[in-house]
Amino acid sequence: MEMMQLSFASAVVYSLIFFVFLLVKQLLKPKSHKKLPPGPWTLPIIGNLHQILGALPHRIFKDLSDKYGPLMRIMMGERTTIIVSSATMAKVVLHTHGLAVANRPINSVAKVICYNNLGVTFAEYGEYLKQLRQLYMLELLSPKRVQSFSAVFEDELQTFVKSIKSEVGQPMIIYEKSVTYLYSTICRVMLGNVCNEREKLIKICKKVSFYSAAPIRIEDLFPSMKFIISRIFSTNSILKDLLKDLDDVLDIVIAERENSQYAQEEEDMLGILLKHKRSDGNNSKLKITNKDIKAIIFELLLAATLSVADVVEWAMVEILRHPKVLKQVHDEVRQAFKGQKTITGSDLGKLEYLHMCFKESTRLHPAAPLLFPREAREEFEIDGYTIPKGSWVLTNYWAVGRDPRIWPKPDEFDPERFRNSDIEFYGNHFELIPFGTGRRGCPGILFGITEALYLLAALFYHFDWKLAGGITPEEIDMTEVFGAGCILKNPLNLIPRLAEN
């Protein structure tokens, strides 16, 4: 009891110190005479946090941008934040000024779980990042490499389908089934068929994703008081414990591979990374250590699992809500794979309509509605407005995807809008950039899309689906929850039935 009282008293004292310090700092802060982008009125100390916290920020930002324009400024605590809300402005910021916004903001969680910002997601822009992205694009996740994973995709897909068949007629959360398949698949393409620590690794990843899901950390918004805030609000101590567990498991995985005959093979990602480590950078400017390898393995485990499961669930829910679309998907998939026991990668390219559905779903429901944040490496100007060095830059892709100037009837799910269209998601068409673009765009776009299409094709080829609880497609709850991504508040609960074929 005394310990609880002491802990509460300490929290109160820290909070008072925090408030007084910020108030004094605000009063003493020199006024800037630079012309910043327009934006809503800000409160002392907290800025515009009162408008964001507890809400769906992509929706709030869209409403504000409708009033203040596609280049808007808000304050998130001490952080000047620029909100980009149109395809045209996204091209100006992310392409024309791409080098100026090539950094990621400092993130207290990423520093913990990404080995002090190693890997492509959170590394500071520079030679290390450029060389690492090249490794991803040319070796780890090149089109040829992704195609070579087909046998693994198809083998794991058979296990996935068997799992669902064993529960035919029973309600299931399709998101959870997808996550299990995706974790197993990415583990095999990264670590090979033999990895004794696979289950431990997946278990730790699930825990880390749970504790790192908050999109905004208070300590990152008030850097001048980070030490005090982290003592009051942070869960980083839990993440540090989990990272220690992760570190131990990955050390075992790497040691086992290095001490085996299999170490000389390169058919999986770990083999490629160890080859680069052994070469000690003789043929490259990139020198890879065990710490780099562990950071890469971990970021791929998270990125290739949760975000893909998110977009698969959204695609399923939209297809199921539209019976005519569902019939076309069934007809196409069952014709393409007629008589086959499983989905084959060589025939995925035939699924034109399913591709259209996937594009339309990511337009409406991107896994990351605000993309990954950028940070200005230098001060620059756009249309006479100053973008200060160190400011955060958020691209509200959710708003871009619902812009009526680009998309007729933008809130409707209409895959036909992509028929005979050359618009793709690879970063060149700024009206469709759910995976980012430019120097910080996702290097694993092809891998993620391939995973998602395998899953969707299998789900609609092998099974017919009925909504659990007797609800109709029109009654599906489309309420969103914003965390590490944007997901359904109530996961899609479905009852599978074997397809007649």
UniProtKB/Swiss-Prot annotation:
Listed result of changing V112I: Reduced activity
Temperature profile: Optimum temperature is 32-37 degrees Celsius.
Gene3D superfamilies: Cytochrome P450
CDD domains in the cross-refs: CYP71-like
Chain segments annotated as transmembrane: 4-24
GO biological process: indole alkaloid biosynthetic process
Subcellular locations according to the entry: Membrane
EC supergroup of this enzyme: oxidoreductase
Functional summary from the UniProt entry: A cytochrome P450 monooxygenase involved in the biosynthesis of akuammilan monoterpene indole alkaloids (MIAs) natural products, components with various biological properties such as antidiabetic, antibacterial, anti-inflammatory, anticancer, and antimalarial activities. Catalyzes the conversion of geissoschizine to rhazimal. Can also, with lower efficiency, support the conversion of geissoschizine to akuammicine.
Family: Belongs to the cytochrome P450 family.
Protein name per Swiss-Prot or TrEMBL: Rhazimal synthase
Organism: Alstonia scholaris (Dogbane)
